Curated annotation (Swiss-Prot):
Gene that this sequence comes from: FSL4
Pathway assigned in UniProt: Secondary metabolite biosynthesis
Source species: Gibberella zeae (strain ATCC MYA-4620 / CBS 123657 / FGSC 9075 / NRRL 31084 / PH-1)
Protein name in the entry: Cytochrome P450 monooxygenase FSL4
SUPFAM superfamilies: Cytochrome P450
InterPro entries assigned to the protein according to its UniProt record, in alphabetical order: Cyt_P450 (IPR001128), Cyt_P450_CS (IPR017972), Cyt_P450_E_grp-I (IPR002401), Cyt_P450_sf (IPR036396), Cytochrome_P450_monoxygenase (IPR050121)
Residue positions binding heme: 494
Keyword annotations of the record: Glycoprotein, Heme, Iron, Membrane, Metal-binding, Monooxygenase, Oxidoreductase, Transmembrane, Transmembrane helix
Length: 557
């Protein structure tokens, strides 16, 4: 337990004794008053040490460049919970001259070391990647959902598990799953079409307004269920089914109270609060347990099917299912419990990120009709029409502009625009000694828009053309492996990158091929007011109030 944690325990005990004496004995011993005064003075001294003395004189990083001014309460932020962490990091990186490392402070003068160049990034993400991990609070919070999924394994265990899971995520294997992605994307389109027909939008005949993110999350959840686990969750057809409702319980929006806990968690261990029997904890546990039971059931079924196939027809594996679970089971390297943890990790990380990218794609295309027409012509020429049926293969090489749009969305709108890691042992970053416990930060929001890492103008603008130039189709003009950190980099990079890069074009292509899309913001003709699109405060790059679009169904495809 930390020093301030012990202080909190002693203060609680003293105050409890104070109240007991006051209520039952109607007197307050001087010893209790002395204790309270001493504890108050200790807190003042502790606070002064960490907010003034340590940052100025004692931090081992005092020689690193840092912003010229700092608030004791808010650090280098413009306020408490009023500015997203990635905006703070980018502002600091742009205003403080540096050689790859910057010392800056968040609320309560909590120190961060911001990594800004490729040399330092390579140390954190590749060369010494296993020296860094998530904070204790983040580990505890996420492990309630995923258990010991791939993101929490370290060292050789991580290498072994990743190596044996990788066959399910190779580009070749994911390509075999794209017909499932396409079928589900078309299922989403049909659902939207039905909503448009039943909608209340009367501004233009044959149109309707839909909110993108709800449809996107249901589509990507069903995709990962069907293609990933061989189990259709059915939320596109029935968003109110038990699976959909239980799954939602796992993703409660962080409250202001949680933000405070995370902030103070740098000094006090609040993990016990996540075990209290309050409604949020009960709902999260219930949702997680429900999904884990489904995962166990599917794993048992896939294991039985695999055994039957291996013991029949002389072990002929032709026509074996291609979902993630079956592929992982075929390696014979995982226990059922380990595989359940990995399934939960894929569920948590594997659908929301693509759904959010799709939402931003609809936002960008929704006010760019010229881009829509260009990609629609391409999609309708080379991708299967809704009436094709029984699609066996989807080839994206023939739709370069669709790929360019998806690549640009992933560059400009990384799902995790900012990340922190904690040094789990003494290590080095760019020749700088980094003691155990140091919090190191890096930001895709910085690297993905860094003019030193990318060629071409207007890196803050949405410009798919950067991916259309000869020789830049796969790089967009980036000159480093650390230029685009949407999927991170190194041995701990996102294992599902190929999945997202195949799934997103299916969703965007099906949507643009089927509808004319118009972004809807502000007051409409019928008096309805729709929100202006903006970023939500939080850890991920999501829209604050959703993205609403007016859809007009297009025929003759």
């Amino acid at each position: 337990m930390s020093v301030i944690g012990l202080w909190l325990v002693t203060v609680t005990a003293t105050l409890s004794l104070f109240v007991w004496q006051l209520i039952f004995l109607l007197s307050i011993p001087k010893s209790i008053v002395v204790c309270l005064i001493a504890e108050s003075l200790f807190f003042v001294a502790w606070f002064f040490y960490w907010t003034v003395i340590y940052p100025r004189y004692l931090t081992p990083f005092r020689h690193l460049p840092t912003p010229a001014s700092r608030s004791i309460l808010t650090g280098n932020q413009n306020g408490l919970f009023t500015e997203n962490s990635w905006d703070v990091a980018r502002r600091v990186s742009q205003t403080v001259p540096n050689s790859g490392l910057i010392r800056y402070y968040v609320a309560l003068s909590n120190e961060r070391i911001l990594v800004t160049n490729t040399r330092a990034l390579s140390d954190v993400l590749t060369n010494h990647s296993h020296d860094f991990g998530k904070s204790n609070l983040a580990k505890f919070a996420l492990k309630r959902l995923t258990g010991n999924g791939l993101g929490f394994l370290e060292g050789n265990e991580h290498k072994v598990h990743r190596k044996n899971l990788m066959p399910a995520f190779t580009r070749k294997h994911v390509k075999e799953l794209t017909p499932i992605f396409w079928d589900k994307a078309m299922e989403m389109v049909k659902g939207m079409e039905a909503e448009v027909r039943c909608g209340k939008d009367t501004s233009t005949q044959g149109t309707g307004i839909v909110e993108i993110h709800d449809w996107a999350t249901r589509a990507t959840l069903d995709i990962i269920g069907t293609a990933g686990f061989g189990y259709d969750f059915g939320t596109l057809h029935n968003p109110s089914n038990e699976i959909g409702q239980q799954y939602k319980k796992m993703f409660l929006e962080p409250s202001t109270a949680f933000n405070w806990l995370e902030l103070l968690g740098n000094y006090i261990d609040f993990r016990f609060l996540m075990t209290l029997p309050v409604k949020k904890n009960r709902d999260l546990t219930a949702g997680s347990n429900f999904m884990r039971e489904i995962a166990k059931k599917v794993i048992r079924e896939r294991r039985h099917e695999l055994f039957q196939r291996m013991t029949s027809q002389a072990g002929n594996m032709k026509n074996t299912k291609k979902d993630i679970i079956t592929t992982a089971l075929a390696s014979d390297c995982f226990t059922d419990d380990q595989l359940v943890d990995h399934v939960m990790a894929f569920l948590v990380a594997g659908h929301e990120s693509t759904a959010t990218a799709f939402e931003w794609a609809m936002y960008e295309l929704g006010h760019r009709p010229e881009m829509q027409k260009r990609v629609r012509d391409e999609v309708r020429t080379y991708l299967p029409s809704p009436s094709a049926g029984g699609v066996k293969n989807i080839t994206f090489e023939s739709v370069p502009y669709l790929q360019a749009i998806c690549n640009e969305v992933l560059r400009l709108y990384p799902f995790l625009p900012f990340a922190t890691r904690v040094a789990e042992k003494d290590t080095w970053v760019a020749d700088q000694f980094v003691p155990k416990g140091t919090i190191v930060a890096y930001a895709a929001h910085i690297s993905n828009r860094d003019s030193e890492l990318w060629s071409g103008p207007a890196l803050d603008a949405f410009d798919p053309e950067r991916w259309m130039e000869p020789g830049k189709e796969s790089s967009g003009g980036a000159n480093s492996n650390y230029a685009m950190l949407t999927f991170s980099a190194g041995p701990k990079s996102c294992i599902g990158e190929a999945w997202t890069r195949a799934e997103l074009p299916c969703l965007v292509g099906a949507m643009v091929g089927s509808f004319e899309i118009e972004l809807v913001e502000g007051k409409q003709a019928d008096g309805t007011v729709y929100p202006t699109v903006d970023f939500k405060m939080g850890k991920v790059l999501k829209s604050r109030d959703g993205v609403f679009v007016r859809l007009r169904r297009l025929e003759d495809w």
